[in-house]
Structure formats: C-alpha cells, structure tokens
Amino acid sequence: MFDFHTHIYDDTRCPMSFLLNVDVQDTGLCGLTSGGGTNGSSLPMEMPADFSCGGVLLSVGLHPWRTEGGWEHWMPRLREWAERDCVVAIGECGLDVMRGASMDVQMEAMRAQVEIAAKVGKPVIVHCVKAMEQLMVLRKEYVVTCNSRGWKPQTWVIHGFRGKPEQAKQLMAKGMRISLGHQYNIDTLRYLFTCGCPFYLETDDCHLPIEEIYRQASIRLGVDVCRLVSRCNPFVDLFRPVTS
C-alpha cells in the first residue's frame, strides 16, 4: 500500500511505499520529523548528479505558508531538484487563504512551480485551503499556457482533500485528482472508489500508520483492503519509472 504524501521519514519502511515531501527551503531532510528507524537522517543541501536518496521517492516544492519574503530565491534550486529521478512530483505548492503571503503572491509562486513541473513532465502535489476559485483560475491558465508552448499539461493532485463529492467532481473534470488523508468526507471516499477514477490515500503529517488509514477506509467502503490498494496505485499512470 502506498502513502501518497508524508512529511515523516521512517527508514524502516520500504522506500518505494511512500512519497516523502521536502520543502525546497529545507536543508535536505533536516526539517522533517523522524517517525522511526534512524534518527537524524539528512540529505545534502545540494544533491549531486548521481544522488538517488536510497530509493526513497520525493516531492519537492515551496509550501504556500512559506511564500513570504522572496519566494523567487528558491526557484533555481527547485528547478535543479526537479530534474532528479528520485523527485517524482513537484509540491506541495498551492493556495491557502488562512496562512502565508497574500493570495496574489501565492498565485505567482504556484504559477512558477507548475511551470517547472510542466517542463520536466512531472505531476504537482497541491495544497488548497478555501481557495478553490483561485485554483480553478490557475488550472485554466496553466492548460492554455501548456498548449501554447507545446507542453503536456501535468496532473495536479489535491492532497488532504476534505471536500464533498461535488467539489471532487469539479476538480477531476479539470484534470485534477484527489488524495485523502486521515480526515475526509465519507461520501467523497465512496464516490472516488465507485467512479473508477484514480485516487490516493496519505498520512501527511499525522503519526497514524498508512496501514490504518487503508484499513479504516476499506471498512467504510465494505471492501477488502487489497481492492483498495489496487485502486490507489500511482505507478499505474502517474509516476515515471524511477531509474536511479
């Protein structure tokens, strides 16, 4: 079973079983919480060309909470990290009306990051809090920009989604996908499972094991957990094969 989005590094877990989020402002993994295994694990600030992170899959981006005070400074580093094979997604980036810089600044920072994702052909992990309208505006802009430049629009995945099925339908109609954390709308879970579209499960920053999140979701759906695991597999059509 795959944990689609986590901030907690645990080196006792199979490296290919989770997507570890790293903020581009952090020095490697030093800003992350250790959830088990070896404490104090860290990555170098500048990843060398042959860096593979021991098989761990990464998403790297600038969180909207950290867009104040010159977000542009971090984009060269993000562009470099985005080229690494172990970085399979860009993010989390996005919009949050409750925290961070002004919405205009957050939108500019997100525009820059989704453009990087389009150039390297990798999906985007999106943080969105009470900014659905603005997110839809950016998605529309993004598709137009990609088409005009000959890029393939990449999938955006809304992580930690707590909205209703109607919201999920709107997002999915625009080429986005949904990832559910430990708190979600049960009707949305049922809709995602029955509609046939890909979706994902995640731990984010909670210490509940991903196995428990899958177990609870399978009980609520009334299905065997193996069926759920097969539905939440990002390697089918989202992530590129990792070659190093």
Predicted regions and their residues:
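Mid-domain alpha/beta scaffold segments of enzyme catalytic cores
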Residues: M1-S244
